[in-house]
């Protein structure tokens, strides 16, 4: 059992000390063996704090794994608040019998993702539960970032006439996880879109483009996100189906498995609203995969999809769970 996680690895004794030294601290060199981490808030900045938990299945999927997802998910929540990611905590709940090699692989992936995002994993916790009391491994990450006080992105800052933009192809993470779960593959491979969003947000803000709202397109996909943003406001969101950037492999997978691409999750995509004069520059900064997908008008909190065949259909929040455990 030397290659497996044992209950003793969570006991606080010699086995746990060995696990921390040879697996956790080896992957996260900024973690100190103390009860927490201490940091200063840069002068003139606001502290932004967020937390998220990850239970994705399978743990490893095309283009990513639960470790990369756990870092990017929290980093992206900070980015949507206009905050540069700085400090991350990592909480691991591990099932007895979990392979140590897989744990090392996950921790190494988290370390790489944090470095890519410019953040540091500085504190954490590890618990081991009995066999059958969890499903392999669950991860919680909390993050602290720093934002300029002038930024305050909110649905009520969106204005009639604003243009809706997404930064890349929709639904790729959800379909990559589904493919991994079913053991099928695409040619060429369809990887998860999991990625840190801060570099793109930083580029926008640095160019003086301050969106009315930003929201990462995760569970519930674009449809649910747009419906949530519009709800209760004197605005309507109009989405143009012909403009939605959806990879042909995502379309094919959705056709086969009975999903609507409008509601499939991404993990490296976000929606933003900008004024008409800033659209061209925003698209340039976001890169060639970005697309202008709709507009905002005066209305009553509704979302409409203008279809490729000339119809218009309402877009409502996803009523239930279409694809469970995708993050």
Regions found by a protein language model. Give the residues of each.
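Active-site-proximal betaalpha loop/short-helix elements
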Residues: 14, 95-97, 190-266
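Active-site glycine-rich loop that binds ribose-phosphate moieties when present
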Residues: 140-153, 185-206
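Acidic, Ser/Thr/Pro-rich beta/coil linker or hinge segments at domain junctions
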Residues: 286-327
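Glycine-rich phosphate/pyrophosphate-binding loop regions near the starts of catalytic domains
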Residues: 6, 14-166, 172, 177
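Extreme N-terminal starter segment of soluble prokaryotic enzymes
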Residues: 1-5
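Helix N-cap motif at beta-to-alpha junctions
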Residues: 273-279
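Short Gly/Ser/Thr- and Asp/Glu-enriched loop/turn motifs at secondary-structure junctions
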Residues: 33-34, 264-269
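Aromatic/hydrophobic pocket-lining residues that form π-stacking "cages" and hydrophobic walls in ligand
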Residues: 74, 110, 226, 250, ...
